[in-house]
Amino acid sequence: MANYDSNECVVCMEEKPLVVFEPCMHHNCCESCSGHVSNCPYCRADITGVYLEASVKVKLEPCEHIVKLIKITEKKCSTCDQDTTGMVIVDGKLTKTFKAENYRNAARLKNIIAMLIKAAKARNNRPGFFRKMKFGIPSVFTNYIHLDSCVICKKEIKEEVGKTYMHACCTATICKPCAKAILKAMVEKEITENLPFCPYCFTKTPIKYGLNAEGELLDPPSDSFSYYYVNEYMKMINNQ
């Protein structure tokens, strides 16, 4: 059969693997760990859905009979005894559904946060750090400078109020969810001094202007980069 079975989750090595990945149909992660992977740990295929194994019904190929996945023990249809060449999920409890691109965007945001935190801590004792960062930008960051879409998640920003950040250095716009994620990480790491560079283009230039939660144009002091926006974030979460 198409499944890759394991007696324990290949990620945490503790829980039993109770979910099935779509479309590869591999069975090697517990439900908790399945939310932290974007590719199947066994075949590296992009995951588009995660199902509870016990609930899954599949249509076998080529006979097209529908059977419960947990009842399949060999590469033969239990109804017609014909050899199976594949299977497709037709029913089951879907625990998660996503596009692989969403996970790549999340990874991109996570990398930006890590780089910002690392640079903020290293700024005082590594003078060559900024040059290395500026010229070591991954190519994935290029060609995404659009005022109507977030440069991190690439989702369209339909309302002006959603343009939380607009960087004068590169005109890049970051949507409110991505901006909040960056700020939340900075607050958790207790980094409240100026950020060392623009989160998008890595230019060593503070944000010149931005929009607050009400969509009003802001004019922070020219050297207020992180401190200003961390305070804005704290106001935002305190008002929720």
Swiss-Prot record:
Alphabetically sorted, this entry's keywords are: Metal-binding, Repeat, Zinc, Zinc-finger
> Is Membrane one of the keywords?
no
- Name the chain's protein: Putative RING finger protein ORF96
As one GO molecular function, the record gives:
zinc ion binding
Q: Which SMART domains match?
A: RING (SM00184)
Write the lineage as a comma-separated list.
Viruses, Duplodnaviria, Heunggongvirae, Peploviricota, Herviviricetes
- Disulphides: none
Q: Which domain of life is it from?
A: Viruses
Q: Where are the zinc fingers (RING-type)?
A: 9-44, 150-202
Any single Pfam family the record assigns to this protein:
zf-C3HC4_3
Specify the species: Ostreid herpesvirus 1 (isolate France)
